Swiss-Prot record:
Residues 7-22 have a biased composition (Pro residues). It is found in: Nucleus; Cytoplasm. SMART domains: HMG. The lineage of its organism: Eukaryota, Metazoa, Chordata, Craniata, Vertebrata. This is Transcription factor SOX-30. The keyword Secreted does not apply. Residues 531-540, 726-739 have a biased composition (Polar residues). One of its GO terms (molecular function) is DNA-binding transcription activator activity, RNA polymerase II-specific. InterPro entries: HMG_box_dom, HMG_box_dom_sf, SOX30_TF. One of its GO terms (biological process) is spermatid development. Interacts with CTNNB1, competitively inhibiting CTNNB1-TCF7L2/TCF4 interaction. Residues 1-45, 140-161, 514-540, 726-753 are annotated as: Disordered.
Length: 753
């Protein structure tokens, strides 16, 4: 629609002289479709109009042969031919009745010649057949060559959805026919007359900025299935409605498919068509209706549900005028000392009785809420006497309870769940082990941690099997990489020995010692080294079975006497994820493990439940399961955590030399009990640094035999608060049966293993 208008011709000339026109009543006109050729689209390019029937040769057979020829016409001309009324009639349409109508490029509706006026340039459209047309009014944007001051420019376009070219098309050739209304009320001659007046450079003002597009319904034009009867009389059964469809240029992009029904009535020759529908866009007035804001009342959470009257209640009674006697600071039934009252509590204590008396229907909670609201309404000057009174109460409380520190009651607050289950109970040492879902999946430790039980003066190594870990008693004799400790999260981990034929010896050497001053150690004597394939199954039935006896300090540790080999093979500690290489034999592997630390939450302020005993350990990384405390990250013993992990420095000499160890945990220093013997270092001492900061000093003497010395007796009073923790309920029932037997029975068991 953007192409420029051609130079309009002043008068339309027919191809031949017009003969006497036939009456147009009962005549249907055919319009030949004209399309520009696919050659360069110039305004003077010729178009070929082919006259044919929409239903084959049914209609074209009544036309003279001269009609069915190609006419060279201009792109803006359309050939109109009258349709023969019947096949048997003699009066056929002559080619002289064909008219080429001159029209502007933006006017698309082409009527047949008018019979009333006789002028070939003033066409009319008489509805004679029961047909209805689709009229679509499309807004047309003004091009650069159109002048908006002249008036709204529009056009009439015919054809089913043809907006580019002038086309009245059907399913067959490029022919279409106009149908009228059987009632004779559809009159559009003024539209055509104004359309043909476009030759003088003026466009019809009745067509406001739109394009009338005549469309036939979906089944207006039948294909060749129609027989000769509907083709001869021009009747096509179908209904149509007149639709006004403005485009997006008029009412916005969302109104493009809006269709408004439009009724066309018969108008006199001097009248103009008026669109009865939505007015143009410039006439639309949108009034902004102000939205009345609805006040939303946010109900405060502190407001009581019942209206409490405070008009006649005095809320500024001074503490000196209240007459409330000083109540002593009482303790509850558990001995808990109450906190001193603050300023609000002092004020509420004075005014609560009066407010409750004024509102007998309110409960205690509603009175408390209202007291809080009224307290917030007071100024600082009004609150000052109550702050002074609260300070006096606080000082008096400090005098009565000098060392009192406020501690919230444990039952009123949700604490962190302690999922720590103690493996051993009674006089045995606690091992921190969590539930199987929270165990840190530590991969392939080198050696295992072996902790004995000291229930009786004569006890035996106790191996523990928990849902997460298993602590075996044997240790590796040869330096080949063998994994003896492998925790599992899903099920109980088994002892994984890569080489079952490895000769193993008990990790706990058979030694006895009477006390801290006893230095005489029994030598190991046995027939030979026994091969131990799995640990001795020992279990503990319950925590109540073994009582907390104070005989640990006088306990005597004894095991079966087995002669160890003359040379020991030791493996230097390596990173936990690295394989263990073959290491050179170290003659004197006097290695010990620092005492396992209890749960960090129970380091201070917890009465000891179990007595301290002497642990034994093997070299290599150690396992510290995770816990809920923030400073005990899994594994607990790894990483450089200042003041959160124990730093044990042990100096272990020969059996007649002094044993000394320095322990530091959570910035508290503890030391082992000093001995009277003087500490001396051997010149062939070897040291290896572990990842968790534990240093081992392996020294040896010039003697041929080596002994694995026990940890000396420690200061129980200084260490029992650190290494002990209350036994929590384990995740599963753990039973360790401790069987007392003499040395012969134990030797027999070890020989069987």
């Amino acid at each position: 629609m953007e192409r420029a208008r051609p130079e309009p011709q002043p008068q339309q000339r027919p191809l031949r002289p017009a003969p006497p026109l036939l009456p147009v009543e009962g005549t249907t006109f055919w319009a030949a479709a004209v399309e520009p050729p696919p050659s360069p689209p110039t305004l003077s390019a010729a178009a070929s109009a082919t006259l044919a029937s929409s239903c084959g040769e049914a209609v074209a057979s009544g036309l003279p042969p001269a009609v069915r020829r190609l006419l060279q016409v201009k792109p803006e001309q359309v050939l109109l031919l009258p349709q023969p009324q019947a096949r048997d009639e003699e009066a056929a349409a002559s080619p002289a009745q064909a008219r080429l109508l001159q029209f502007r490029p933006d006017l698309r509706l082409l009527p047949p010649p008018s019979a009333s006026e006789g002028a070939p340039s003033r066409p009319e459209l008489h509805p004679v057949q029961p047909r209805a047309l689709h009229f679509k009014a499309k807004k047309q944007e003004l091009g650069p060559g159109l002048d908006p001051s002249v008036g709204p420019r529009g056009g009439v376009e015919t054809g089913p959805r043809a907006s580019r070219v002038v086309k009245l098309e059907g399913p067959g050739p490029a022919l279409a026919y106009f149908r009228g209304n059987e009632k004779g009320k559809l009159e559009a001659e003024e539209v055509m007359r104004d359309a043909m007046k476009g030759g003088d450079g003026k466009s019809p003002a009745a067509i406001r900025e739109g394009v009338i597009k005549t469309e036939e319904p979906e089944r207006l034009l039948e294909d060749c299935r129609l027989d000769a009867e509907p083709a001869s009389n021009g009747l096509v059964h179908g209904s149509a409605e007149v639709i006004l469809a403005p485009t997006s240029g008029a009412f916005g992009p969302h109104q493009q498919d809006l269709r408004i029904p439009l009724t066309l009535h018969t108008v006199p020759p001097g009248a103009r068509i008026q669109f009865q529908g939505a007015p143009p866009s410039e006439l639309i007035r949108l009034t902004k209706v102000p939205l009345t804001p609805v006040p939303i009342k946010m109900q405060s959470l502190l407001e009581p549900s019942v209206k409490i009257e405070t008009k006649d209640v005095p809320l500024t009674v001074l503490p000196s005028d209240a007459g409330i006697p000083d109540t002593p600071f009482s303790k509850d039934r558990n001995g808990h000392v109450k906190r001193p009252m603050n300023a609000f509590m002092v004020w509420a204590r004075i005014h609560r009785p009066a407010l409750a008396k004024a509102n007998p229907a309110a409960n205690n909670a509603e009175i408390s809420v209202q007291l809080g609201l009224e307290w917030n309404k007071l100024s600082e000057e009004q609150k000052k006497p109550y702050y002074d009174e609260a300070q006096k109460i606080k000082e008096k409380h400090r005098e009565e309870f000098p060392g009192w520190v406020y501690q919230p009651r444990p039952g009123k607050r949700k604490r962190f769940p302690l999922s720590v289950s103690n493996v051993f109970s009674g006089t045995t040492q606690n091992i921190i082990s969590t539930n199987p879902t929270t165990v840190y999946p530590y991969r392939s430790p080198t050696y295992s941690v072996v902790i004995p039980s000291l229930q009786n003066p004569i006890t035996h190594p106790v191996g523990e099997t928990s849902p997460a870990i298993q602590l075996p008693t044997p240790a590796v004799q040869r330096p080949s990489p063998v994994t003896l400790f492998q925790p599992s999260v899903s099920s109980a981990a088994q002892v994984a020995v890569q080489d079952p034929s490895l000769p193993l010896y008990p990790a706990l050497p058979p030694q006895r010692f009477a006390g801290p001053s006893q230095t005489d150690t029994h030598q190991l004597h046995s027939e030979g080294t026994h091969t131990v394939k799995q640990p001795t199954p020992v279990s503990l039935e319950s925590t109540n079975r073994i009582s907390n006896s104070a005989s640990t300090a006088h306990a005597r540790f004894a095991t079966s006497t087995i002669q160890p080999p003359k040379e020991y093979s030791s493996v230097s500690p390596c990173p936990r994820s690295a394989p263990i290489p073959q290491a050179s034999p170290i003659p004197h592997p006097h290695v010990y493990q620092p005492p396992p630390l209890g749960h960090p939450a129970t380091l201070f302020g917890t009465p000891p439940r179990f007595s301290f005993h002497h642990p034994y350990f093997l070299p290599g990384p150690h396992y510290f399961p995770s816990s809920t405390c923030p400073y005990s990250r899994p594994p607990f013993g790894y990483g450089n955590f200042p003041s959160s992990m124990p730093e044990c420095l042990g100096y272990y000499e020969d059996r007649y030399q002094k044993h000394e160890a320095i322990f530091s945990a959570l910035n508290r220093d503890y030391s082992f009990r000093d001995y009277s013997s003087e500490r001396t270092h051997s010149e062939n001492s070897r040291s290896c640094e572990n990842m968790n900061g534990t240093s081992f000093y392996n020294s040896h003497s010039h003697s041929g035999e080596e002994y694995l010395n026990p940890v000396p007796q420690l200061d129980i009073g200084a260490l029992e608060n650190v290494f002990t923790a209350p036994t929590s309920t384990p995740s599963s029932i753990q039973q360790v049966n401790v069987t007392d037997s003499d040395e012969e029975e134990e030797e027999k068991v070890l020989r069987d293993l």
